[in-house]
Amino acid sequence: VDLVVVDEFHYYGDPQRGWAWQVPLLELPDVQFVLMSATLGDVGLFRRDLETRTGRSVSVVRSAQRPVPLHFEYRTSTLHHSVEQLLESGRAPIYIVHFTQKDATDAAQGYLALDPLTKDEKVRVREAIGDFRFDSPIGKDLKRFVTAGVGVHHAGLLPKYRLLVEKLAQDGLLKIICGTDTLGVGVNVPIRSVLFTQLCKYDGTSVPILSNRDFAQIAGRAGRKGFDTEGDVWVQAPEHVVENLRAEEKEATSNSRKKRVKKKAPERNYAHWDQNVFEKLRDGEPEGVHSHQHDKNHVIDCLRSREVGIVDGERVEGCAAVRRLLEAHVGAGARRRGLSGGAGGVWGSGG
């Protein structure tokens, strides 16, 4: 192998999947790499490390120009009304971003009444589906959704269902797609508009605001090169804020002397966002990409499944391959030592 092109390289910093992007850099020092991402941020770490380990000069090529410009808007209307406006103004397909699979699936039901397909499009959907087997509980729901022009897309669906949604979307037969923030690598779903339902996400321990990188990656799905001249990214205000604004407007126009309506509180697992937060995410630079110590189990499991590992061009077997790879790991010295020191324990725990 002389040349390796690595797309979506920002996943190098993913706590679970990052090793899939890290290992080639460590195991193939004599190979030329092209590392690509729209949201890399500061790449000084990689430039210095690659130059040190490979002895080659490293060029950084940057461009902030999008072939399809995006228009951003912060919304204080209800989510349903925002979807209606996008449909009425011809800005479909719309990808509605949820942050759990259940929320995405549950939301799809509510958009059936919008009836976004023409009669001709409904016929085309039925023809495209043909004798496709929706042979599971979620499959029966999905059939109702897609025949109405509404799709669901997330990792919890069977692959055949995800592929069907992608095909119908590519044919222009889905006007609304409810999905999660994970839509990305290897997925080709044409999107005209992206609609964020929120700007915070539970990460397993807490509920932080999205990073600049995550926001940019999701927003970047809007606008289809070759199909659209522009794309739209809308962000909903928190649901309780929208409801409270509506209650205040209703109270202001009412002649009733009833007691003031109590304001609705935010839902659980919530971090506050507003227009200022939205603008910071819209205008912010992506954070730098860093490796993670706690993803070592993934690479160790991968390496020990091989009878022989290749490190620095040499055949290295067993635990030695794991240790040598971890010692070459890009990162601070203390982090590198922590990774290497944990390898023996993880290796031995597999039985």
Language-model-derived ranges and their functions:
Residues D7-F9, A38, T180, T197-Q198:
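Walker B catalytic acidic pair
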Residues V1, R162-E166, Q170-Q198, G220, ...:
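Beta-edge loop/turn motif
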Residues K102-I176, G204, I209-R213:
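Conserved C-terminal RecA-like helicase domain
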